[in-house]
Curated annotation (Swiss-Prot):
<keyword id="KW-0812">Transmembrane</keyword>
<dbReference type="Pfam" id="PF04286">
    <property type="entry name" value="DUF445"/>
</dbReference>
<comment type="similarity">
    <text>Belongs to the UPF0754 family.</text>
</comment>
<keyword id="KW-1003">Cell membrane</keyword>
<dbReference type="InterPro" id="IPR007383">
    <property type="entry name" value="DUF445"/>
</dbReference>
<protein>
    <recommendedName>
        <fullName>UPF0754 membrane protein SERP1382</fullName>
    </recommendedName>
</protein>
<keyword id="KW-0472">Membrane</keyword>
<keyword id="KW-1133">Transmembrane helix</keyword>
<feature type="transmembrane region" description="Helical">
    <location>
        <begin position="356"/>
        <end position="376"/>
    </location>
</feature>
<dbReference type="GO" id="GO:0005886">
    <property type="term" value="C:plasma membrane"/>
</dbReference>
<feature type="transmembrane region" description="Helical">
    <location>
        <begin position="4"/>
        <end position="24"/>
    </location>
</feature>
<dbReference type="InterPro" id="IPR016991">
    <property type="entry name" value="UCP032178"/>
</dbReference>
Length: 376
């Protein structure tokens, strides 16, 4: 009986020692969280293994994740899988449908991004438009008009001179034939007679003032139809045109005048475009064809563009993200108690098995120690 009790006692003692030893060993992985000192000497095994090796563990985990788990090749493969492609395309379709069904405006979309679209468009249009025009003027103000304008345009203008001659003659005939033209001729003739006095008054002995005015009107109309008159007008216009096109730009229009005209054109352009109204109207009303185009063709192209663009620039993206450093920094920010609970939650069964194995091995060792003690 004494022998059996000795063996049982040794088994229980060995099991307790083995189990408790494993429990202490597991605890020592995490505890203590900080080193303890006696005088100036640090107590061995403080802090625990994981707190002590925390930075190294974080660095190794980051390295493993970057080099073996989340690699560039793996991400490329995932991006090009049909499931990923379909998911991206469905997301694009969803956003397009939202644009179509909701009263989403350009102003509202810009507002989400913190942009005042009306102010931005007005600023961009004003600065770009005026800067372009001012730059063009500064670059060309000392050049002749014939050097600035295309030759085809100059030839076309020259070809219009005969048409202008015919136009001027026709307008002159219409004016001279009108009641106003007849009245103006009579008034000018009356003024002329009054200024020239008696000598001119002698003409009235042979012709009345009305007949003289009628004669002048008839002759002026005839002159507008005479080929020689038309040739003279054409020659004058040609000479003026040649003189005009050989002038420098700044002789034709001064810099301040050009700026004033540019501002007037810009104001008219803004009024015509009415961009403020367009930014406050639903996109489906402003550009319905664009929404239809997005539905019919763009979603697939955008999906291809996103996948190809991401794959192409993935190396640079991964470098900028620096996954290894990101994981390392994140792990180093974790509270040690949180890390302990996390590991215990993950390996709870295995840790319990280790403690149980400690009890079993301790009991077996205790059994053999008891047997040996009987024979010693």
């Amino acid at each position: 009986m004494h022998t059996i009790l000795l063996v049982v006692f040794m088994i229980i003692l060995g099991a307790i020692i083995g189990g408790v030893t494993n429990m202490i060993a597991i605890k020592m992985l995490f505890h203590p969280f900080k080193p303890y000192y006696i005088f100036r000497f640090r107590i061995p095994f403080t802090p625990g293994l994981i707190p002590k090796r925390r930075e190294e563990i974080a660095r190794k985990i980051g390295q493993v994740i970057e080099e073996h788990l989340i690699t560039e090749e793996l991400i490329r493969q995932k991006l090009n899988q049909p499931q990923s492609r379909n998911m991206i395309q469905q997301l694009i379709h969803k956003q397009i449908s939202k644009l179509k069904n909701d009263d989403v405006t350009i102003k509202k979309i810009a507002g989400f991004l913190g942009i005042d679209v009306n102010e931005l468009v007005d600023y961009k249009l004003t600065t770009k438009f005026l800067n372009k025009l001012n730059f063009w003027y500064e670059s060309n103000k000392y050049r002749k008009l014939s050097e600035i304008l295309p030759q085809s345009f100059l030839d076309q203008c020259k070809g219009q001179i005969e048409y202008i001659t015919d136009f001027l003659c026709e307008r002159a005939r219409n004016y001279l034939s009108s009641e106003k033209g007849e009245r103006d001729i009579y008034e000018l003739l009356d003024t002329f007679f009054n200024e020239k006095g008696r000598i001119i008054g002698l003409l009235q002995m042979f012709m009345t003032k009305e007949s003289i005015a009628d004669r002048i009107q008839h002759e002026l109309i005839r002159l507008t139809q005479h080929p020689q008159s038309q040739k003279i007008i054409t020659k004058v216009l040609n000479d003026e045109y040649e003189t005009f096109k050989d002038k420098n730009l700044d002789e034709i229009i001064k810099e301040q005048q050009f700026k004033n005209y540019s501002q007037l054109v810009l104001n008219e352009l803004k009024t015509y475009l009415n961009l403020k109204d367009k930014t406050e109207r639903p996109i489906k009303q402003v550009v319905p064809q664009f929404i239809q185009f997005l539905e019919d063709d763009t979603s697939k192209r955008m999906t291809d563009f996103i996948i190809k663009g991401t794959s192409k620039h993935l190396t640079n993206i991964m470098k900028k993200i620096n996954l290894r450093q990101l994981v390392e920094e994140q792990i180093n920010t974790f509270d040690l108690k949180y890390i302990e609970n996390l590991i215990i939650d993950i390996a709870n069964k295995e840790l319990k098995l280790i403690m149980t194995l400690g009890f079993i091995l301790g009991g077996i060792i205790g059994f053999f120690q008891g047997v040996i003690a009987i024979f010693v």
